């Protein structure tokens, strides 16, 4: 990776961070920027594989997801409203997978794409806190239950009206969706843990220097 690309990544990761932000606020902002980047890369990979397999379905919604992520990110970088950015990004993570599933057909034909919605409550834990994350998880479960309810009761009608996805294509995207979400969650947790360890090391170093100064005085 070149110095220019590394500098760009660093600027994106620290975008919106103010000098007066606490360590926790800095971590929350960095995590959400990291999550946005991971989701963008994963959805781009999703589109590339989608086009290579050539299913007869529109890729408008997945492409629109990328556009919305980018626009929301640009708005945040320009105006710096982290609360709006946080809620709007998590809302995209939560609702968009279900919209895509409903447009395709059902849980099976959409290859379990609703698993992407799990990024919203997981992200809420990391970016907001445990108490705030409960509402996001409840919303995810509600959408999942509602989708399952309608899939169960409208299964026969959907089989007749919705275009069928080749089984091999469905299997590929089942694996891709679960692998992508699992990877994003793992990388986010790993990043959060590393950053917290760095913060603890800085705190320990500051405490050590303070003790040295006290011993000298």
Language model features with spans:
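Amphipathic alpha-helical coiled-coil "transmission" helices that mediate dimerization
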Residues: 186-187, 191-194, 198-216
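Non-catalytic regulatory/interaction regions at protein termini and inter-domain linkers
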Residues: 1-25, 56, 155-160
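N-terminal membrane topogenic signal
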Residues: 23-36
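Hydrophobic transmembrane alpha-helices and their membrane-interface boundaries in multi-pass
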Residues: 34-109, 113-123, 140-145
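Membrane-water interface at the C-terminal end of transmembrane alpha helices
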Residues: 125-136, 185-194
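Alpha-helical transmembrane segments and their immediate juxtamembrane flanks
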Residues: 85-86, 95-98, 146-198
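Membrane-interface elements of multi-pass transporters and channels
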Residues: 19, 55-56, 79-82, 106-107, ...
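The cytoplasmic-loop to transmembrane-helix boundary for the fourth helix
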Residues: 128-150
């Amino acid at each position: 990776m070149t110095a220019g690309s590394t500098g760009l990544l660093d600027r994106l990761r620290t975008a919106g961070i103010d000098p007066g932000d606490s360590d926790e606020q800095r971590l929350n902002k960095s995590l959400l920027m990291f999550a946005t980047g991971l989701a963008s890369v994963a959805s781009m990979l999703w589109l590339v594989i989608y086009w290579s397999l050539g299913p007869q379905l529109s890729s408008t919604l997945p492409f629109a997801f990328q556009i919305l992520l980018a626009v929301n990110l640009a708005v945040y970088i320009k105006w710096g409203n982290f609360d709006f950015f946080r809620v709007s990004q998590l809302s995209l993570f939560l609702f968009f997978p279900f919209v895509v599933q409903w447009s395709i057909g059902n849980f099976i034909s959409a290859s379990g794409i609703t698993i992407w919605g799990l990024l919203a409550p997981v992200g809420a834990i990391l970016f907001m806190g445990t108490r705030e994350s409960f509402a996001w998880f409840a919303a995810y479960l509600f959408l999942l239950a509602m989708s399952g309810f309608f899939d169960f009761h409208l299964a026969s009608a959907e089989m007749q009206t919705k275009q069928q996805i080749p089984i091999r294509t469905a299997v590929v995207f089942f694996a891709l969706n679960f692998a992508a979400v699992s990877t994003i969650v793992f990388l986010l947790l790993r990043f959060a843990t590393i950053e917290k360890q760095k913060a603890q090391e800085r705190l320990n170093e500051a405490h050590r220097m303070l003790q040295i100064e006290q011993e000298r005085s």
